Design a protein with these regions (language model features):
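ATP-binding/phosphotransfer module of carbohydrate and carboxylate kinases, centering on a glycine-rich
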Residues: 1-91, 95-144, 192, 217, ...
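A short acidic Gly-Thr/Ser loop motif
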Residues: 59, 67-75, 153, 207-208, ...
Length: 492
């Protein structure tokens, strides 16, 4: 087979270049949208106040509950914080019955969730649970309640640390009577109906949880400044000065602890530059967006997150297969693409293929060959085909990593975080940053190309994997919430 296939792959790959000048333009626009989001509501970057006003330092202690409703599974865990940056975690997971995901009544769903919490307590914390029932029977004074962090991964309007109204359901859920209601109150109502010793102390976003978990397990001099997820989706949360959040004066919210002068902001950066003033936009990006179920929104996420990179690659491969001889039998190969290959199906290519192909250093790209067979049922792809695939994978993955530097650089610059000699700690989670080879390296290359960061600023940024924001992170937010509540009671 001629190298025309490779030439074409190289040409397409160039369209995914994201040079230093573009990174710098992106950073300027991100800072503009970031400040706009801190000033007012209904902006491109939501910049949601979380009402979490401090981060842990690793000495926190206690037993907390966390529940996570983010998709088809419901997870209940208890986290015992040992006070020395370590913790132990016990958990159970249950699939949510399909009929509850789209039922007429939110009460059914939340009662189901509360029953799972009850079952978990009876199995794992039975002594505490029985003692609670005993005290309740005897009517003896002060109850010992478990504080619970509720990770609820749907769009919510947060109005307090444990108060947030559901904006809309996503991910296959559709229970209209919950929309516009406070999801913490719905869960608490179901818990109270079953008379459980549990208080919903905090509404948790998993990205904020990532930041908190990192701050507890890897405390530096200053605590963690930013948490970011680069996985199926992408988002970031960071610590902002209260006096840089003018919209706190105008939005409706419950009382909160102002003593630290700071608050974690949930950026919701997947929607950065929805109007495409600075983001790169290849033909494949345009097609993916037009055929998605939410055209015109989450434009940053559609170029960065795992859910979409596989689809961008699939479209580029399909284009080359249809027009430029990729995966076509030739002198050196008897390649076969069956009709039922997922190459021909939207969302048919899982992003894990990209990590495998990027990591393949074998002479004849055997791992890539195997991956094409496993993922796309393509048999006996030639080495030239595999090289073309690797060329495209490299370009798409590298662009995603370089784009990821944009919000990071922008937040570092806008908050003045690089003005001191302190290290800036960043906690990251997600399959891309964890498994895609050199994702952090490409991200740092782009960071250094931003003049206000440069090599000196890049050296101050410490990036570490932070696992389980919706478990240990949620528990830590419940802890901070109960401390804040106690402080405010005292102040009154």
């Amino acid at each position: 087979m001629s190298s025309a296939v490779l030439d074409e792959a190289t040409r397409i790959a160039r369209e995914f270049d994201y040079p230093a000048a573009e990174v710098q333009r992106g950073v300027k626009e991100y800072i503009r949208e970031m400040d706009e989001g801190l000033r007012q509501e209904h902006t491109t970057l939501s910049q949601i106040p979380t009402f979490v006003t401090s981060v842990p330092n690793g000495t926190e202690k206690g037993l907390y509950l966390a529940v996570d409703l983010g998709g088809t599974n419901f997870r209940v865990c208890s986290i015992d914080l040992h006070g020395d940056t370590t913790f132990s975690l016990t958990q159970s997971k249950i699939m949510i019955p399909r009929e509850l995901m789209a039922s007429g009544s939110s009460k059914d769903l939340f009662l189901f969730l509360a029953r799972q919490i009850e079952a978990f307590l009876r199995i794992h914390h039975n002594e505490h649970f029985e003692a609670h029932l005993q005290r309740r029977r005897e009517g003896s004074g002060e109850e010992e309640l478990f504080d619970l962090g509720f990770t609820f991964s749907f769009p919510v309007r947060q109005m307090g640390i444990n108060k947030g109204t559901l904006i809309r359901w996503t991910k296959g859920f559709n229970i209209p009577d919950a929309v516009g209601h406070d999801v913490c109150a719905l869960l608490q109502g179901a818990i109270d109906e079953l008379e459980l010793p549990v208080r919903v102390a905090a509404l948790v976003n998993d990205t904020v949880g990532t930041l908190m978990a990192r701050s507890y397990t890897s405390p530096g001099e200053t605590g963690t400044f930013l948490g970011a997820i680069f996985g199926t989706g992408t988002n970031g949360a960071y610590l902002e000065k209260l006096d840089r959040i003018p919209k706190m004066q105008t939005i409706e919210h419950s009382d909160y602890d102002k003593s630290t002068g700071e608050m974690i902001i949930n950026a919701e950066w997947g929607s950065f530059d929805n109007h495409l003033s600075v983001l790169p936009n290849t033909l494949y990006d345009q097609q993916l967006d037009a055929d998605s179920n939410n055209p015109g929104v989450q434009m940053f996420e559609k170029r960065v997150s795992g859910m979409f990179l596989g689809e961008i690659l699939r479209r580029a491969l399909l284009d080359m297969h249809n027009n430029k001889g990729l995966f076509k039998p030739g002198q050196s190969s008897d390649v076969l693409v069956p009709e039922n290959s997922t190459l021909f199906r939207q969302w048919g290519l899982d992003t894990s293929l990209l990590s495998t192909v990027e990591a393949d250093k074998t002479q004849t790209l055997e791992q890539t060959k195997t991956a094409l067979k496993d993922h796309l049922k393509i048999e006996q792809a030639s080495t030239t085909d595999c090289k073309a695939v690797q060329t495209l994978v490299h370009a798409i993955g590298k662009r995603a990593a370089r784009l990821s530097a944009v919000p990071l650089a922008a937040v570092l610059i806008a908050t003045g975080k690089l003005q001191t000699d302190d290290l800036v700690d960043v906690g990251v989670d997600g399959s891309l940053v964890e498994f895609y080879p050199n994702f952090e390296g490409y991200m740092r290359d782009a960071l250094r190309e931003v003049p206000e960061v440069g090599p000196a600023g890049d050296k101050k940024v410490r990036i570490g994997i932070s696992k389980d924001g919706s478990g240990v992170g949620a528990a830590l937010i419940a802890l901070v919430a109960s401390k804040e509540e106690a402080r405010m009671k005292k102040a009154k």
